[in-house]
């Protein structure tokens, strides 16, 4: 192992150790994978702020998230400025939501009740009189590498800022790792529109689509072929697209498959269809197999129209399934079966397999997805859902008051026991991003940096850094989560990757 990497891994290991006893600070400047409940102590360690100076480091094409956290509301404005061309800063008001009941163990461990920061509202007029603020620092692909200076203003206080732009370059919008499912009717309802695919509805959906693409995710519905044409415009720079088929009869299955094949003829995009979600009984699995076989007879199947199931490999499926969504399949039997042409992806997350989507967990939770996706060669990660504004599975037509009660999925309404805060919700009505969506973006950008390092012939370097941070996940993981819950080790690992790119990858 080369000396720079060895020293870097030693520093990373030191950061994984518990912090010593220090007084809680009155100011913290942290990244987008930190989540501090209202009234809780601010982080004693920061990867961005030390010695009275904020230090930022970014690749070209990368967006950094910067949170400014105070123990009390400041008099005056909180503002961030940088003197650099092709660097754009967007300020957000960061508001909390009240978690009164901790999410159940179906989602992993909860950090308990409290006011959690999550709702981000653009603040073009500035942020006044608040105890917290959030900034996106977007470094353009043509930004000049080197050191650039700026200033963080907190009321009358001035803190110097340094931004180091690297030669590395990423493109977050192209070939997204994460597919985020949504129902067009949910978006239409919250905006007072009919669910009829008129231009007004598509334009509103585009706002949400663009929000997610800016964060490295594909927001796409799982609709039948008759509703695809108005949304074809969203199928850009992707390798895969969800394609629903009507499985109420064999004739309808075959008709939809043939229509999809016509619609996608001449495209490099591969369709995939999940006719039955999360089959649990023998009868449901038999039905999955039957639908898959009918799809195959109609001309579907790998490589162009993938028959998918959100389940682990099971003998009943035989060779009828082309694509499995389950963390339990990875790395095995995925590695053995990929030679047959089968694909193995994953969905959602729960420790120790992957971080959870819920509000009341650690800020790094969704950052794990990008790193895990890299380590285990996942082509697509399915997030159910992203815009679950109404708990239609449990409450029917009743809208969820998300800002006052973030329990978005509640099986107690129909006799169950599980419920989750923010489950299926990565953005709020009005196309407002959540802090969790920012953490997801952070991990997806980390993945692109790891891939760039690997493309420069440094796969062993990149994987050593990633394995030091996440020793095990997905189907390899049992017991407790294996990754750190604080941001500093993640940023140290990211810096090691950037160091490797600077040393080994030509500009």
Where in this protein do the model-derived segments appear?
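An acidic-aromatic substrate-binding cleft motif
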Residues: 159-247, 261-272, 277, 306
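Bacterial N-terminal signal peptides
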Residues: 8-19
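Acidic (Asp/Glu)-rich catalytic clusters
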Residues: 212-213, 228-239, 256-269, 295-301, ...
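Bacterial N-terminal signal peptides that target proteins for export
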Residues: 1-9
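Catalytic-core region of carbohydrate-active enzymes that cleave or remodel glycosidic bonds
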Residues: 318-408
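Catalytic domains of carbohydrate-active enzymes that cleave complex glycans
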Residues: 257-282, 294-311, 394-507
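The substrate-binding groove and active-site-proximal loops of carbohydrate-active enzymes
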Residues: 186-200, 242-252, 272-285, 322-327, ...
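Ligand-binding face of N-terminal immunoglobulin V-set domains in extracellular IgSF glycoproteins
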Residues: 24-157
């Amino acid at each position: 192992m080369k000396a720079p990497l060895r020293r870097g891994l030693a520093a990373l290991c030191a950061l994984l150790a518990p912090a010593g006893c220090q007084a809680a600070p009155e100011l913290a400047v942290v990244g987008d994978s930190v989540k501090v409940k209202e009234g809780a102590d601010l982080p004693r360690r920061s990867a961005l702020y030390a010695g009275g100076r904020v230090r930022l480091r970014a690749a070209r094409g990368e967006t950094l998230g910067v949170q400014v956290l105070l123990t009390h509301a400041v008099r005056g404005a909180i503002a961030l400025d940088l003197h650099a061309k092709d660097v754009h800063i967007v300020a957000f008001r960061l508001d909390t939501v009240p978690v009164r009941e901790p999410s159940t163990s179906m989602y992993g461990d909860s950090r308990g009740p409290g006011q959690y920061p999550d709702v981000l509202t653009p603040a073009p007029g500035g942020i006044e009189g608040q105890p917290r603020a959030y900034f996106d620092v977007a470094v353009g692909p043509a930004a000049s590498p080197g050191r650039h200076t700026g200033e963080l203003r907190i009321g009358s206080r001035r803190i110097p800022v340094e931004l180091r732009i690297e030669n590395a370059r990423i493109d977050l919008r192209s070939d997204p790792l994460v597919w985020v499912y949504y129902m067009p009717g949910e978006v239409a309802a919250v905006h007072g529109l009919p669910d009829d695919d008129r231009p007004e509805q598509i334009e509103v959906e585009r706002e949400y689509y663009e929000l997610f693409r800016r964060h490295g995710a594909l927001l796409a519905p799982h609709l039948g072929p008759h509703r695809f044409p108005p949304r074809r415009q969203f199928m850009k720079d992707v390798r895969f697209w969800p394609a629903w088929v009507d499985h109420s009869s064999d004739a309808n299955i075959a008709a939809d498959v043939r229509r999809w094949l016509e619609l996608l003829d001449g495209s490099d995009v591969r369709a995939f269809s999940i006719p039955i979600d999360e089959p649990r009984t023998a009868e449901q699995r038999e039905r999955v197999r039957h639908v898959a076989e009918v799809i195959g007879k109609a001309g579907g199947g790998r490589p162009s129209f993938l028959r998918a199931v959100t389940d682990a490999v099971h003998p009943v499926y035989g060779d009828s399934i082309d694509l499995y969504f389950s963390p339990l399949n990875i790395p095995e039997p995925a590695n053995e079966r990929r030679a047959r042409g089968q694909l193995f992806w994953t969905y959602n997350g729960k420790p120790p397999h992957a971080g959870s989507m819920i509000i009341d967990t650690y800020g790094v939770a969704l950052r794990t997805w990008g790193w895990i996706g890299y380590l285990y060669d996942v082509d697509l990660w399915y997030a159910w859902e992203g815009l679950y504004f109404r708990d239609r599975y449990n409450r029917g037509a009743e809208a969820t008051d998300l800002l006052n009660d973030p329990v978005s999925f509640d099986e107690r309404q129909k006799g169950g026991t599980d419920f989750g805060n923010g489950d299926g919700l990565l953005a709020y009505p009005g196309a407002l991003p959540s802090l969790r969506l920012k953490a997801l973006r952070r991990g997806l950008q980390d993945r692109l940096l790891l891939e760039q390092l690997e493309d420069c012939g440094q796969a062993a370097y990149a994987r050593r850094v990633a394995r030091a941070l996440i020793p095990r996940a997905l189907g390899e993981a049992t017991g407790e989560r294996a990754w750190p819950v604080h941001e500093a080790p993640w940023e140290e690992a990211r810096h090691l990757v950037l160091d490797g790119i600077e040393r080994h990858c030509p500009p």
